Every structure is written in structure tokens, then in C-alpha cells.
Regions:
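Conserved catalytic-core segment of nucleotide-activated headgroup transferases in glycan assembly
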Residues: 41, 191-299
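Short N-terminal targeting/anchoring amphipathic segment
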Residues: 18-23, 82-98
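Nucleotide-activated donor-binding/catalytic signature segment of Leloir-type glycosyltransferases, i.e.
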Residues: 296-316
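N-terminal subdomain of nucleotide-sugar transferases
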Residues: 1-51
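A donor-sugar binding/catalytic signature common to diverse glycosyltransferases
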Residues: 90-102, 316-338
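N-terminal beta-loop-helix "entrance" segment that forms/cooperates
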Residues: 53-70
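Active-site-proximal region of nucleotide-activated glycan assembly enzymes
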Residues: 114-216
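A short helix->loop->beta-strand "cap" motif at the edges of active sites that frequently abuts
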Residues: 110-115, 279
């Protein structure tokens, strides 16, 4: 049987396009570094900036950088003309559900330009995902498990190489995010028509990020202790339910539930009714959501409505805090509010 070696999507992008347009990237200088890499590989890289935060991490003085400060309604025609004029063959963005990126995907497809989207890594840590045509629920990846079982024997066996660790974690990401929003709100007149994909109020973010930092510091020691208990198997058999950021596109666009809260309560209800008596459930609150949403009130209300459960608030390492619920007859619910 002839075996196949899969190319990664970054290599596919590199080989399929000479003129590449970058839209908004993740907070930080990732797209600037990507542009440098593409340029070093002989590509002509164009970039659209939509706000002053974009300008800070990708200076408009970079070659082929365009300041788009027209109205949102003018964007489709502007993009169409730009693609035609500069012979753009690939459009690249981070997140395929931002307002401008939704339009960009349609315009790219109409003009025979490929559309590529980066996303937080499907595999973590140390990875970022890149897919053609869309990510998450828009991903072209097959949904059938048997597809992968059928394809695996056809793939050439390769030696696993662990990814190079990336320095940092939460702190550098938070610094980049704070800097981005400071720039965005400090100079709104340059981009008076910009539409952000999340709340666009500086005070809103400052207050809630401050709460997140305080919670992180407050829970630090207890997080380490809980992590050791989990690793030592103190909680026995358990299911784990990771929660998404409350306003993430996965929730707003792709989720079958109207909110993370409704999903959480559904899971707790199902677990309380159907779980084996010797199992626990750990619900992980997203680390970026700690200052924005506190699900502990919902969980306490749930426990009150189900007197067979009682709860004790604890915390968890890695991400936020953890809530542990114990049933007298031995059903345990470990929920994390990271």
C-alpha cells in the first residue's frame, strides 16, 4: 500500500499563493511575525488594519499595509477591488466569525482566492490551528470517526517530535490584550466606523480584568493544592466538562445552547439524575472568564433545588477554581470555576 505523508496547512498556504492578504490576527505580534516569515519565503504580504490596536502590533509603515477606516457597509466593495487590483490569491485571518472576516470569506470565494483562518490550537499547549475555508464548526475536517480509522493505515509512520515550549502563559497574553485595548480606545477617531467583535468599552474590560487578576492571586496556593489532589486520584473516577468563554463564537454562533450557563445547568441536571454513584464531575471554568462570569451562584442555586447534593468551594490549578459537590449517598460533583 502506498503511504502518504501529510503536509501541514501552513506549507499548503505557502505553496498555493504568491500574494497574500492578512486581516485581523490574534492580539499581539503574531501576524507581524507571520508576515516576516512569508516575505522571507518570497511572498508578497498585504495587511488590513481596522483599529489602532491593530496599528500598534502591525505598524501601518509596514509595506502594503492598508488603514481601513471607512464604514462597514463599504468594506465588501473595497475588499473586492483590492483583491482584483493586487491579484490577491489568499486571504488569511484569525477567527472566521468576526464581522469583517465573515464578509472576507464570501468575497474571497467569489474572487477565486483561498480563505484561511487561524484559531486557538485544537491541540494544546504550544499549538495554533490553521485551516482552509474555516475553523471550529466551519472546519472542513470530516466528522466521522471511521474516516480517521480508515485513513490511518495509509499514512507514513513518523517519529513524534514534541513541540518547542512557548514561554509565558497567561501573563504575556494579558499584557498584550491590555495594550491592544488601550490603543484601541485611546485613538478612536482614526477609525470612527470600526465595529468590534466584542464589547468596546475600556472601563468594562479594565474592571473585569482586574477582578480576574485578583482572583488568580487569591486562588494561587489553593489551586496548587487541588491540582495535587487531582493528580493523586483523590477524587476517584470523574467526568470533566470544560466551559467556554461566555461570549466566544463557539457559544454565540455554533452552540446548541443559548449560553454557557444553560449548558452548565443541563449538564448538572443530567449528572445528578443519571451518573453512577461512584463518579464525580469536574467542570472547568475558562481562565479568561473568571472576572466576567461567576457560575458559583448558579451552582449553589442548583444544589438548593437538589437537596441530595451539598457543595464545597475549592480551586484548581492550571486554570481557575474548582467547585466540589458531594452527595450523601456518594455521588460527587466536582465543578471547576477557573
Amino acid at each position: 500500500m502506498k503511504q502518504t505523508v501529510l503536509q501541514n496547512n501552513l506549507q499548503n498556504l505557502l505553496e498555493s499563493a504568491e500574494n497574500i492578504l492578512l486581516l485581523q490576527g490574534p492580539v499581539g505580534n503574531f501576524f507581524l511575525r507571520l508576515a516576516d516569515w512569508l516575505t522571507a519565503n518570497g511572498k508578497t504580504v498585504h495587511k488590513f488594519n481596522f483599529n489602532a490596536g491593530d496599528d500598534y502590533f502591525y505598524p501601518p509603515t509596514q509595506a502594503h499595509t492598508v488603514v481601513f477606516n471607512d464604514s462597514y457597509d463599504a468594506f465588501p466593495e473595497f475588499l473586492q477591488e483590492y483583491i482584483a487590483q493586487h491579484h490577491i490569491q489568499a486571504v488569511v485571518c484569525f477567527g472566521d466569525t468576526r464581522p469583517y472576516h465573515i464578509i472576507a470569506k464570501r468575497i474571497a470565494n467569489e474572487n477565486q482566492a483561498s480563505f484561511w483562518a487561524f484559531e486557538e490550537g485544537y491541540f494544546r499547549p504550544y499549538y495554533i490551528t490553521l485551516e482552509k475555508d474555516g475553523v471550529n464548526a466551519f472546519s472542513p475536517l470530516p466528522r466521522r470517526a471511521d474516516f480517521f480509522l480508515e485513513q490511518f493505515p495509509k499514512l507514513a509512520q513518523q517519529e513524534y517530535k514534541a513541540p518547542t515550549p512557548v514561554r509565558g502563559g497567561f501573563t504575556p497574553m494579558a499584557k498584550n490584550a491590555i495594550r491592544y485595548y488601550i490603543e484601541l480606545f485611546r485613538n478612536p477617531n482614526k477609525y470612527p466606523n470600526y465595529i468590534h467583535h466584542r464589547a468596546s468599552n475600556a472601563g468594562h474590560y479594565l474592571k473585569l480584568w482586574s477582578i480576574s487578576i485578583l482572583k488568580r492571586l487569591n486562588y494561587y496556593i489553593e489551586d496548587i493544592q487541588i491540582a495535587k489532589r487531582v493528580e493523586a486520584g483523590k477524587y476517584g473516577k470523574f467526568f470533566i466538562v470544560p466551559l467556554q468563554v461566555f461570549n466566544d463564537s463557539q457559544v454565540r454562533i455554533h452552540c446548541d445552547f443559548p449560553s454557557v450557563r444553560s449548558f452548565l445547568l443541563h449538564v448538572l441536571s443530567s449528572f445528578a439524575e443519571h451518573a453512577p454513584a461512584d463518579t464525580n464531575i469536574i467542570i472547568k471554568h475558562h481562565p479568561m472568564d473568571r472576572g466576567f462570569i461567576d457560575y458559583w451562584r448558579d451552582i449553589k442555586r442548583f444544589i438548593k433545588e437538589h437537596p441530595e447534593l451539598k457543595g464545597l468551594l475549592v480551586k484548581k490549578k492550571f486554570r481557575p477554581s474548582e467547585k466540589h459537590f458531594r452527595r450523601p449517598e456518594a455521588i460527587n460533583i466536582l465543578a471547576t470555576a477557573m
